[in-house]
Amino acid sequence: MNVGKKSNLKKNIGYFCRHAAVSGLVLSFLSRVAKNHSPSPCSPPPRAQVVSLGAGSDTLFFRLHAAGKAPTLFVELDLPEVVSRKAGTIASTPELAAAVGLPPPPPTLAGAPSSRKLDRIVTERYALLPCDLRSPSPISTAIRRAREGGEGGEGGGGEGSTSGASFAFDPLAPTLFVSECVLVYLPPEAGDEVLRDAFEMLSVGGKGGEGSGEGGGSGGGDGRRSGGGGGGGGGGGAEGAVVVFDPCRPETAFGKQMAANLRARGCELPGIGAATDPGAAAARLRRLGWESRGEGRGAGEGGGGRGGCSAADLRAVWDRLLPREARAHASRREQLDELEEFNLIMEHYFLAVGVKRGGEGKALEGFGLASLTE
C-alpha cells in the first residue's frame, strides 16, 4: 500500500469520527428534548430547533429527515453565493424539494426538472439563509430578516421560497447550534461574536425573540454583557447548546506544518489561536456565557464530561466516547494498522460542547460529550 493511500485511510477514519460524533450529539439533543416532554391530550409535540453555521453542502437535515428524526425547524446559514447554489439544487431536485417542504419543480420540455433561481429557502420546517458570520450579531440578524420577509437587505424571499411569515423560529424552544470547521476561519473577535450571539438569542428578551433585533447588543454596542456571559447564568429563556468542531494545537510541529500546507493553498486559519487546545475551547465557551456547571474530567481535557462546557480532542473522542462497534467497523473497513500518525492527526482537532439552561427546563441536564456513550 503506498503512502498516499495510507494517509487517505487515516483521513477517512478522521472524517468518520467527526461525522459520527457530531451526528451523535445532534441525535442526543433531539432525543433529550423529546423525552423531557410531558405529553397530554391537548399538548402539541415538543419543539426542537437546530441551527447549522456555515453549512455549505452539508446534508445533515436530509439525513435526519430520511430517518424520521428531523427537528421541528432546521436552519442553515452561509454566505449568499453558497446559499444560492444550494437553494437552486434543492429546489430543482424533486426529492430534496419535498423534504424541505417546497412544491415540486416544474418539468422542462425534456421531462427533467427546471433550474430554479433562489437566494434563500424558507419553509415551516427548513430555512436556508444568507449570512456573513463576520458581521455583527450575524445569527440573530439573519433570523430576524427571515421573519421580516427579507427586509433590510441580503435579498428577500426569492422565486420558489415561501413567505417570511411562515418562518417559525421560536426563541423559547430548545435550540442546538452546530459549527463544524467554521470559527477557525474567522478572526477571534468575530468567532466570539458568533458564540455570544447564539447564547444571547436563547436568553430572556434575547435577540432571537419576537420583535427583537434592536437593543439586543447588535453590533456589540449597548445591551451586551462585557467579557463573559455569566458562566452559565442564563437561567431564563430557552434551553440550548452549541457544538464546535475545529483544528487546534497550532504551536506543535505538526500544527505548524498543517497551517503551512493550508496557507500554501491560499487558506488561512485566523481563528485557530482562539482555541489552541480543548481546554482553551471549553474556557472560551464559558467566557461567552455557556454553562460551566457540573464539570468533571470524564470526557477529555476540557472537563465537563456530564454537562456544562466539555471538550476533547478527536483522539479522545475516538478512544473513549464513540461506540466500540463503530470504531471496530471503521478500523476494519479502512485497514487501520499504523496508529502513531493517526493519533497525531486526531490530536489536532477538537470537539467542544456548551450548554445553556433555561427556566425550569431539564431536557439538557448532563448534555455534553459524554452523551455519546449513552
Predicted feature descriptions by range:
Residues V204-G209, G236-P250:
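Conserved beta-strand signature within the Rossmann-like core of class I S-adenosyl-L-methionine
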Residues M1-L129, P136-E151, G157-F167, P171, ...:
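Rossmann-like AdoMet
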Residues P138-I143, Y185-L202:
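A short, conserved alpha-helix within the catalytic core of class I
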Residues S40-P41, G149-S163, G208-G237, R297-R306:
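Intrinsically disordered, low-complexity regions enriched in glycine and serine
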Residues P130-S135, P247-K256:
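Short, conserved secondary-structure transition motifs
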Residues G255-E374:
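Rossmann-like AdoMet/SAM-dependent catalytic core
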Residues P174-E189:
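A short SAM/SAH-binding and catalytic strip from SAM-dependent methyltransferases
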Residues A67-G68, E193-V194, Q257-R263:
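Short secondary-structure boundary/capping segments
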